Regions:
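Class I SAM-dependent methyltransferase Rossmann-like catalytic core
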Residues: 2-58, 69-85
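Well-ordered alpha-helical segments embedded in enzymatic catalytic cores
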Residues: 42-46, 142, 175
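The AdoMet/dcAdoMet-binding core of the Class I SAM-like
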Residues: 52-152, 158, 170-173
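Cell-envelope and extracellular/periplasmic
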Residues: 160-162
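Short glycine-rich, flexible loops that bind phosphorylated cofactors or substrates
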Residues: 165-166
Length: 175
């Protein structure tokens, strides 16, 4: 199903909101809606709805299915910081493209992420970040294998893999 020979073939795409995303040759689609934009999509479709429903929690565990460029994770941190929330967050994120994660410290992220550049750098180098408020772990490999090994209770799930048409393995009911 997956074609590893195409994994490194990606093209940078400028979205209508001015943010950048990538187009995956392997999955024949962009990582984000080029019309909505990467940041807008992450905030409006994933982060804000999830955090509004969890606003009274002081600790959250989030499963960000398919880390990719990290927009959902980084938008979560950005939102928590800009809203002045004291929520402690642990994010677990499966990702099979280690090369992509390791390249994130050179990706052209929006200025909204300037305050978390040190986090992006740590994740790209160590696949991990932790401070008193945020803990982020990248689970390298197939999400179908890493997710069953998660021991803690997950409060929020960002299901943001490539579309069911192009990545049906992550949209089945058996996983």
């Amino acid at each position: 199903m997956y074609n590893e020979s195409l994994r490194d073939q990606k093209e940078v795409v400028l979205c209508e909101d001015g943010t950048h995303t990538l187009f995956s040759i392997e999955f024949d689609e962009p990582y984000h809606s080029t019309k909505d934009g990467a940041l807008h999509e992450s905030l409006e479709k994933h982060v804000k709805p999830a955090l509004v429903l969890s606003k009274d929690k002081t600790n959250l565990t989030i499963l960000d299915i398919c880390f990719g460029l990290g927009y959902n994770t980084f938008s979560t941190l950005h939102y928590i910081q800009t809203q002045g929330l004291n929520t402690k967050v642990h994010i677990l994120s499966p990702e099979f493209d280690e090369g992509l994660v390791r390249s994130l410290d050179t990706f052209d992220f929006p200025p909204e992420f300037d305050s978390i550049k040190h986090i992006i750098k740590s994740i790209s180098q160590d696949l991990y970040y932790e401070d008193e408020q945020f803990k982020i772990e990248i689970l390298l490999g197939d999400a179908r294998k890493s997710i069953p090994n998660i021991q803690e209770k997950v409060d929020i799930i960002y299901q943001d893999a490539f579309s069911p048409v192009h990545n049906p393995l992550l949209w089945t009911t058996e996983h």
